[in-house]
Design a protein with these regions (language model features):
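A glycine-rich beta-to-alpha transition motif near the start of alpha/beta enzyme domains, typified by
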Residues: 1-108, 119, 131-134, 140-216
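Short "repeat-start/strand-capping" segments in structured domains, especially the N-termini
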Residues: 126-127
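Short, solvent-exposed secondary-structure boundary/capping segments
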Residues: 108-114
Length: 216
């Protein structure tokens, strides 16, 4: 199978978009093959879908999750294909409403709406307390001053078990003093576990955790 793809680098979160139609049942396997190509250095895969009449574009991630960086990047792609739109209306996976991406092709920038947390709560995993932020479809467990490791992710994975309808989950290792975060994200359908160069939803989760504002 030959597929047309587009490699995007939104803030280091390398995303490959498959531009040809792909059946949903095949997406996980194709994403795994794409992510296994060393030269692409892909952290995730998104799929272009035929857009409905009320939007400019439609994109679905490999596991049906929401991704802010991929949304921004796909918005920029659609803007370039549609004569330089400055506002792009997108339907994206993991979000129950149309998302607007604001694009400046000349400056090479794009912004996208991010979902508000569905719930925020304190949780403990591996003997460390953190903040569990459910953004609907994707949730993150934010911990401070914990050495980033897959072992800690495995220890923390149970904190997500009570959250419904998750497509993806991540542990965000936050160094508040250095203002640096290290995201480790799992897409449930594909089983992929990836150290991401950046993470839009993880950034939102960190901001919520640092704000100290608890919704429940």
């Amino acid at each position: 199978m030959k597929l047309n793809i587009l490699r995007a680098d939104p803030a280091g979160n390398i995303t490959v978009f498959v531009l040809d139609p792909v059946e949903r049942a095949q997406r996980a396997a194709i994403a795994a093959r794409i992510m296994a190509i060393p030269s692409l250095k892909a952290e995730q895969v998104g799929y272009a879908c035929p857009p409905e009449d009320d939007v400019d574009g439609h994109m679905e991630m490999m596991g049906g999750e929401f991704c802010g960086n991929a949304t921004r990047a796909y918005g920029m792609y659609i803007a370039s294909q549609r004569g330089g739109l400055s506002e792009v209306r997108l339907r994206v996976s993991g979000c129950d409403h149309v998302v607007t991406a604001r694009v400046d092709l000349r400056a090479g920038t794009a912004r996208a709406e991010m979902p508000c947390p569905r719930s925020v709560q304190r949780a403990t995993a591996g003997g460390r307390e953190g903040t569990l932020v459910d953004l609907g479809g994707i949730a993150h467990f934010v911990v401070e001053n914990v050495e980033p490791s897959e072992e800690f992710f495995r220890a923390a994975e149970g904190v997500f078990s009570g959250l419904p309808n998750l497509d993806a989950c991540g542990v965000i290792f936050l160094d508040a003093q250095e203002r640096r975060m290290t995201p480790l994200v799992k897409v449930i359908e594909t089983g992929s576990l990836v150290w991401e160069g950046s993470c839009g939803s993880g950034t939102v989760a960190c901001a919520v955790a640092q704000s100290g504002h608890m919704t429940n």
